[in-house]
């Protein structure tokens, strides 16, 4: 078990609501409304890495892959509770739209 997950008294996820490759929408936070593809699900820490979301800059030492080193932009983790499947999100938005139209009509 991961130390970080252990310190928060969390059990690893048995069944994740999203899987690698799923299209998701961020539902809360500074990246709200943005879409992306799930690259990795971290079950021990209840987090996901989504393509193009929450980009951070990281200093990298020179290596064989990157002989110059420097600063690299990469995706950071997001809490799994802050993302929702895109299909589910669209259904939710459609439902809200219909409710608003009914309210306006009478």
Swiss-Prot record:
GO molecular function, one term: structural constituent of ribosome
Lineage: superkingdom: Bacteria
Region (Disordered): 1-20
Biased composition (Basic and acidic residues): 8-20
Swiss-Prot/TrEMBL keywords: Ribonucleoprotein, Ribosomal protein, RNA-binding, rRNA-binding
Annotated GO biological process: translation
InterPro entries the UniProt entry points to: KOW (IPR005824), Rib_uL2_dom2 (IPR014722), Ribosomal_uL24 (IPR003256), Ribosomal_uL24_CS (IPR005825), Ribosomal_uL24_KOW (IPR041988), Translation_prot_SH3-like_sf (IPR008991)
One term under GO cellular component: ribonucleoprotein complex
Function: One of two assembly initiator proteins, it binds directly to the 5'-end of the 23S rRNA, where it nucleates assembly of the 50S subunit. One of the proteins that surrounds the polypeptide exit tunnel on the outside of the subunit.
Family statement drawn from the similarity comment of this UniProt entry: Belongs to the universal ribosomal protein uL24 family.
Assembly behavior: Part of the 50S ribosomal subunit.
HAMAP family found in the cross-reference section: Ribosomal_uL24_B (MF_01326_B)
Name the UniProt record assigns to this protein: Large ribosomal subunit protein uL24
Organism: Methylacidiphilum infernorum (isolate V4) (Methylokorus infernorum (strain V4))
Gene assigned in the entry: rplX
């Amino acid at each position: 078990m991961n130390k970080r997950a252990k310190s928060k008294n969390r059990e690893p996820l048995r069944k994740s609501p999203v899987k690698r490759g799923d299209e998701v929408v961020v539902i809360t936070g500074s990246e709200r409304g943005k879409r992306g593809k799930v690259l990795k699900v971290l079950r021990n820490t209840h987090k996901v890495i989504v393509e193009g979301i929450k980009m951070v800059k990281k200093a990298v030492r020179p290596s064989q892959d990157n002989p110059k080193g420097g600063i690299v932009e990469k995706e950071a983790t997001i809490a799994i509770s802050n993302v929702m499947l895109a299909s589910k999100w669209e259904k939710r938005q459609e439902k809200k739209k219909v409710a608003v139209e009914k309210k306006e009509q009478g």
